[in-house]
């Protein structure tokens, strides 16, 4: 069995390209750790950059991208199950598993072996919370996490009212229905963190946002709405899907959308780094690199 390699980093750090070039070199396959790239036809807004999976004339196999329909709400429990199916398959075929992404909760869940069980919806709780603001819900969630000592659901993944309500629902369920530890074992992994200078990251985020808008991100969202997906379901996915949906539906002007979305992505990248630093405090050893050459110096 091969020791997994994990490549993590904030948005616009270049982690996917580093991971795919590594995969081409060591006969690896990528398991995505991105909470939004699981959705089909949500390509531009999630930054799938599938061209990065073609290296030196070779297609790099990838997993957990384009696996569910847009409009659904994929969750951590499903991700953990899908990850282990992909991981076991890659190991069985003697290939090198490479976990790559920026969703810290997903990465930590599979590395640490979070003990998870499916949590049903709580209609009464949802009704009681539906009129509360995101700030109020965040405060409630913080208090629940204080009670349980939970490390799940930080601000990186709870950036809308719907997401916050679901997080509260899960934390409250775990208080009301404690379950014995069971499930996945922790996975030993060499963890590579792709570091990028803050100002360069901001520059790349701004440049990439404008490129994606030019590529037709608004048309992508119009197409999803045209399929009958309600605007609130797209807003649930946050960032590009939240703000561009508000533009397409007339809530924001184009300039307002660009300005607010750009700020939100910068804040998101900062929260991603906060999560990764938190992982280090929780005992994960992350080897930070700036480029591909640094990576190969770490490999046996």
What would you call each of these model-derived segments?
Residues 1-300:
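Phosphate/pyrophosphate-binding catalytic cores of soluble transferases and nucleic-acid-acting enzymes
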């Amino acid at each position: 069995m091969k020791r997994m390699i994990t490549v993590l980093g904030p948005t616009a750090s270049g982690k996917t390209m580093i991971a795919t070039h590594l995969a081409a070199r060591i006969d690896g396959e990528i398991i995505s750790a991105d909470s939004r790239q699981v959705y089909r036809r949500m390509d531009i807004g999630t930054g799938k950059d599938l061209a990065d999976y073609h290296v030196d004339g070779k297609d790099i196999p990838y997993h957990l991208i384009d696996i569910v329909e847009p409009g659904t709400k994929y969750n951590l429990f499903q991700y953990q199950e899908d990850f282990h199916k992909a991981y076991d398959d890659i190991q069985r075929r003697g290939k090198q598993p490479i976990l790559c992404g920026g969703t810290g909760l997903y990465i930590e869940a599979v590395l640490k072996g979070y003990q998870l069980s499916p949590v049903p919806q709580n209609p009464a709780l949802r009704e009681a919370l539906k009129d509360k603001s995101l700030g109020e819900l965040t405060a409630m969630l913080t208090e629940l996490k204080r009670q349980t000592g939970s490390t799940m659901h930080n601000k990186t993944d709870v950036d809308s009212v719907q997401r916050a309500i679901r997080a509260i629902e899960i934390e409250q369920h775990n208080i009301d229905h404690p379950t014995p530890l069971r499930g996945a074992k922790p996975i030993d992994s060499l963890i590579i963190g792709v570091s990028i200078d803050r100002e360069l990251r901001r520059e790349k985020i701004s440049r990439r946002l404008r490129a994606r808008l030019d590529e037709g991100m608004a048309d992508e969202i119009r197409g999803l709405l045209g399929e009958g997906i309600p605007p609130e379901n797209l807003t649930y996915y946050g960032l590009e899907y939240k703000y561009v949906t508000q533009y397409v539906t007339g809530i924001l002007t184009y300039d307002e959308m660009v300005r607010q979305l750009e700020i939100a992505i910068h804040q998101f990248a900062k929260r991603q780094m906060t999560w990764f630093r938190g992982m280090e405090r929780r005992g994960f050893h992350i080897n930070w690199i700036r480029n591909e050459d640094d990576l190969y110096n770490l490999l046996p």
